[in-house]
Swiss-Prot record:
InterPro entries: Ins_P5_2-kin, IP5_2-K_N_lobe. Its EC number is 2.7.1.158. This is Inositol-pentakisphosphate 2-kinase. It catalyses: 1D-myo-inositol 1,3,4,5,6-pentakisphosphate + ATP = 1D-myo-inositol hexakisphosphate + ADP + H(+). GO terms for molecular function: ATP binding; inositol-1,3,4,5,6-pentakisphosphate 2-kinase activity; molecular adaptor activity. Gene3D superfamilies: Inositol-pentakisphosphate 2-kinase, N-lobe. A motif (EXKPK motif) lies at residues 136-140.
Amino acid sequence: MEEGKMDENEWSYHGEGNKSLVVAHAQRCVVLRFLKFPPNKKKTSEEILQHLQNIVDFGKNVMKDFLGENYVHCGEVVQLPLEFVKQLCLKIQCERPESRCDKDLDTLSGYAMCLPNLTRLQTFPFAEHRPILCVEIKPKCGFIPFSNGVTHEMKHKVCRYCMHQHLKVATGKWKKISKYCPLDLYSGNKQRMHFALKSLLQEAQNNLRIFKNGELIYGCADARSPVADLKALAHHLKPFFFPSNGLASGPQCTRAVIRELVHVITRVLLSTSDKGRAGALRLGLQGARVCEASPFSRSLHHQGKNTPEHSGLPKGCLLYKTLQVQMLDQLDIEGLYPLYNRVEQYLEEFPEERKTLQIDGPYDEVFYQKLLDLSTEDDGTVAFALTKVQQYRVAMTAKDCSIMIALSPCLQGASSDQRPVIPSSRSRLAFSVSVLDLDLKPYESIPHQYKLDSKIVSYYSKTVHAKDDTVRSTRFKEHEDCTLVLHKV
């Protein structure tokens, strides 16, 4: 970043999460990411610089090793003119969702992260003059807990995402329960993956956003957002997926375009184009491979059919590697929490050891190597407890990451394009796949995760599961005196 050339009018609001806000440059394929804080919890410039540097180091030394260097973009910490930051903050304030305005942009330190704009193809430094589509998916946790430490039997049958949906709707976070289940997407079975992606398109919540030429065209900020319009989305997608049957408008065209999008995303997600060391973890999938709450599974069950369990993900694909990192959570939060308390007790007695234990960094090769210890035999030491706590933090990071898929039609006769290509009904599409939202989850959030887990399971058990039991019981009573009649065929 060249200080003398910073003009807030060249930047626009791009989006924000719970802890940071992103602005994008109009011409260059870069974004700036600023930290956010509650008004009463400001940080010093030194603390903010260290926080941002930790994010960069964790991406570079841990997640890039696990997921592959082509997928992970670490960026760099930059220092910006304070006047530019203040003017930029004023410029974008009106574009921020009301639900995100409880935290303020850091305008005092001047530090930010400069990263590539992942809504663009990751080859050129400047915006290309051809249409570029980007699909952002937050897939969430792709497995059901298999730990013996789980006390709620329901957690061995229903995934966390599906249970959490009911609590989120009850508390007004979202208006409607999504039919999406992460286990369907991670199954590797194309039928289940198609259903999962269609469900995300129908009820995006904060798990799916679509950009066209860097501009958001489809997504949901919160419960106040307007209902998703698939017809309008299909209109945007025509330059990429004009249906091969020639239909130019109407419901059939919309269905054809959406179907084409789903098929292309599935093929990209199953593609293997990069190496990473997550395969070295060799964490075999244990426990249930089908979530009982998945509408896809329920529908087949009502038809008397079995859910196609698991075709298996190709080992080199990003979903497989992401799932491997997620499965570093071998104990579930229930089994992990007593180990967290062991570490806490040790730190209360020896607070000066916090730095030695690398709880706040540095996130270097030493930190990474300790994550590879997959033993689950508790020897009662602080070292064992700490390893499991750090693995849990990394696993939670992978459970909350986002996958960015950028697509662009190949130019006629272009042979120099080195990016992977996937066919569609209209043309070949060059694509790039990236991962973002890879900040290591804070050590301090573990007690919150423990309480939230209990709240989610308790609500689901008392409402949804209890209701299902009542329905099953009623059905049984209705058919207690039935007679089975056999007809000769």
